[in-house]
Amino acid sequence: MPKIKTRRSAAKRFSVTGSGKFKRRKQNLRHILTKKNAKRRMRLGQSATVDSTNEKAVRRMMPYA
């Protein structure tokens, strides 16, 4: 049985925490930042965890994580 390939796109976007959850970056922080206030931009800069609904899909894309 051959090894399962890791989806490289997922590996670049997600990282595994010590507890086994997946960490991700928040969206909306690339451009059009002038209309977003400082508080919102700071919140968007923090990392978030992957929702339980999507965790199964991410785990399937990264079999060795």
UniProtKB/Swiss-Prot annotation:
- Quote the SUPFAM superfamilies the UniProt record gives: L35p-like (SSF143034)
The protein's matches in PROSITE patterns, at most eight in alphabetical order, are given as: RIBOSOMAL_L35
Source superkingdom: Bacteria
Protein name from the UniProt record: Large ribosomal subunit protein bL35
HAMAP family hit by this protein: Ribosomal_bL35
Q: Which organism is it from?
A: Nitratidesulfovibrio vulgaris (strain DSM 19637 / Miyazaki F) (Desulfovibrio vulgaris)
Using the UniProt annotation, give all residue ranges assigned to the region (Disordered): 1-24, 41-65
Family, similarity comment? Belongs to the bacterial ribosomal protein bL35 family.
Q: What are the UniProt keywords, alphabetically?
A: Ribonucleoprotein, Ribosomal protein
GO biological process: one example: translation
Basic residues composition bias: residue spans: 1-11
Gene name tied to this protein: rpmI
Under Gene3D superfamilies, the record lists: 4.10.410.60
One GO molecular-function annotation for this sequence? structural constituent of ribosome
Quote the InterPro entries the UniProt record gives. Answer: Ribosomal_bL35, Ribosomal_bL35-like, Ribosomal_bL35_CS, Ribosomal_bL35_sf
Q: Name one GO cellular component term.
A: cytosolic large ribosomal subunit
Q: Which NCBIfam families match?
A: rpmI_bact
